[in-house]
Amino acid sequence: MKITDYSPRSGRMIKEDGTVVNIADLLAGEADAVSGATYNIDSFSAQSGRMIREDGSIINIADLIASGQIGGGGGTGGTSNYNDLTNKPTMNNVEIKGTLTGKDVGLVDKNQGAENAGKILAVGFDGELTLVDRNEPLENLIENYYAMRRTGKVYQTKIWKFASNPTPTGEKMLDNTGLVFEPSTDTTEGQDDYLNGQHPLFEWCNVNYIRDADGSPRPTYIEGMEGYKTSGSVDVGAMQMSFYWNWDTSNAEYDLVTISDTPHPELGLKPWPECVRADGTVMPWCIGSKYISGIASDGKLRSQPGLKPERKQSHNNMITNYQAKGEGYWGAGAVRNTFQIIFNIIKGATKSSQALYAGCTSYSFQYEAAVQSEEAHTYFPVTNAQANSIVVGGYVSVGYGYSTGSTISNDRGNDSVHAYADSVKVLSIEDLDENNKAVYLDIPEEGAFNTMPHVYSENLSAPVILTSIHYRSGATDAVRGRHDGSPGSNTDGKRPYRVQGREYAVGGYIVASDTMTWQNEDGTRTVYSAKKGTEHSSVTNTIQSTYKEAGTIPVNSSGSVGDYWIGDVGVDFDTGASYPRAQGSGSSQGVGDYYYAGGTGTNAFREYLQGGNLSVGANAGASCLYSGYTLSGAHWSYLACD
C-alpha cells in the first residue's frame, strides 16, 4: 500500500494529566510539509497518548515527547537542542553524533590480532578481498592464497582403450560429472562450468617468471602488479595452482585420467612434473610458458606476446639458445604438450585435440602477385578466388624464391621468401578491381614493396609471392575471458588455440627440449626423456646414461617400420613425456593424430617434433609426433617454447 492511501490523523494527543499536546509539532519543528493540503485541526478529535509496548506495559508517548525524553521537548511545539536530549540514538553502545566511521561504531573490529599487524586488504585472483602483508614475498602470498582455495575435488575422465572401443569420446566421472565445457572464440563465449567460481584448480593468470638452476619456475610479478611486463628481458607464463594427477591404465578396456588440487594417495595421484623441483619439493604453483618463443629486444628467446616465432629450432641448438638466458633454461620439454592433452581429456572429455580445436594446421598457400606493379604498396594483390583462402588476422610473408642456379625454390626456409615482409598480420582484404583483391598488411609505409619479379639473371627471375606463415605469439589473447579456444574459429584449421592460458598450434612443430626417440632394430622406438635438473646433451652416450627411458613406441602393426594413426598414448610420470602407445585407424577414431616413424634407420636418436605444422591438416593434433630428423635437424616449421 502507498502512504497516500491513508488519511492523516491529528497530531494532538492527550497526556496523563488530561492536557493536550501536538506531537507532530514537537517532533517536526520547522520541517517542510510533505503535502500542500491543509486541514482544520479543530475538526479532528485528540487521540490518547497511551501506547502498548511489546512487553504489554503501557506508556504515554505524549508525556515522553513533551518532557523531552524522546524526540523534541518542551511542550510548546518547538524543538530542543540535540545535545540536551535524554534518549539519544546509539549503535553498539556508541552515541550517534558528529562524524563517525564504521570502526567508531564497532562495525569493524578494532582488534584484528597481532598476526595481522601491518597487513592490508587486497583483491585476490578471484576478485575477493583478502588480507595480505605488503612486505611478504610474492611467493608466500601465492602459496597462502592457493592453500585457502584448494577444495579437494577430484576430476576424472574415463577414456577407452582403442582395442576395446575406438571412440575418442570419454566419460566424465566423480567431481567432473556433469560439468559442461565448450571452446570459445574472440566473439563467442562457450559454456565453461570450470570457470564458474567453484573449481579454483582451473583458474589461471598471467605472470612474469624466472627459472632456478634446476629449471623450476618462480613467479616474479602477476599481471596487474606494478612491475609486470610483456617486453624486455622477461618471460610471460600462465600460472594456476599446483595439482596432482594419475593416468591409470590397469583396466583392460579403459584408462582413468584424474587430476585434483590435493594429493589423494588413495587414488595414486602424483604431483604434476612442472610443479616439482629436482629435489622432490612440490611447489604451490604450476607455471608454463604462455607463448611460442621469439627473439625479444634483449636478443634472447622469450615467451612474450607479439613476437615472430623463431624458426629453425632443433634439439641441439636449443641447448645453446636457451642456456644464453641462464643456468636453468633449456627450453620446454614434452611435458608442456602433455599438459594440454590432460586438460583436453578432463574438460573436453576427448582423446582428440582436433575434436575441440583444429589449430593452424590447414593454412598453407603461396600465391604469385596477381598484378605486377613497379609502384610500391602496403598491400599484396591476389585473385578473388585466392582471397577466399586468406584469413584476416592471419600471418603471411612477402618475398621471392631462392635461386638454386637454374631453378627457383619457394621453400619457406629461404630468407628471400620473407624479404619484403616477414610474418606480418593481414589487416583487411578489399576489392582491387573486378578480378582481384588487395590484401592489406600490417607494415609501415616505408616498408611498402613493388610486385615486379626479382631478376637473378637474364634467364632466371623469381615472381613476388605471398606465403602463409606461423602466427605471431599472442593471437589467442583475443579469446574471451579466461576461456580456452581460438580467435575467429576453432574448426577452420587456420588459427592457433590456447588451453589453460597456454598457446598452441601456431603453424609449426614444437621441438621437445628434453625428449627424443632411439631407433631400435625391430622398428620400435625407445623414448628418452630428461628428468628435471638433468643437464641436456647432444652426445649419445651421455643421453643414454643420464636420461630416463620413458616408454616404447610400438612398431607398425604390419611388423615393419611405417607411419600410422595413433589409437592410444602413454605417459611418463617423472618427466611428463607422452608418446604413441597403440596404433589406431584414421583421424576420427582413437587419438586421431599421426605418428611419423622416421624411416628404417637404426641405432640413432631422432628429435621429438610435436603437434604438426600448417600443412598437415587432420594428421596434426596434440599427440602428433614426427620422429624423422636427427637431433640437429632444423627447419622453418620447427619452433620451440621456454
Model regions and ranges:
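Fibrous stalk/shaft segments of extracellular and virion attachment machinery
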Residues: 2-136
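Extended N-terminal export/anchoring regions of large proteins
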Residues: 114, 135-298, 319, 325-331, ...
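Hydrophobic beta-strand signal
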Residues: 122, 397, 510-511
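Short, surface-exposed secondary-structure boundary micro-motifs
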Residues: 126, 401-402, 515
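C-terminal, surface-exposed recognition/capping segments
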Residues: 142-165, 426, 509-517, 540-642
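Surface-exposed intrinsically disordered loops and tails
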Residues: 222, 353-377, 404-418, 452-493, ...
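Short aromatic-cysteine micro-motif
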Residues: 231-234, 264-401, 415-423, 427-505
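Short catalytic/ligand-binding loop motif for oxyanion handling, primarily in non-cytosolic enzymes
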Residues: 247-249, 296, 338-341, 511, ...
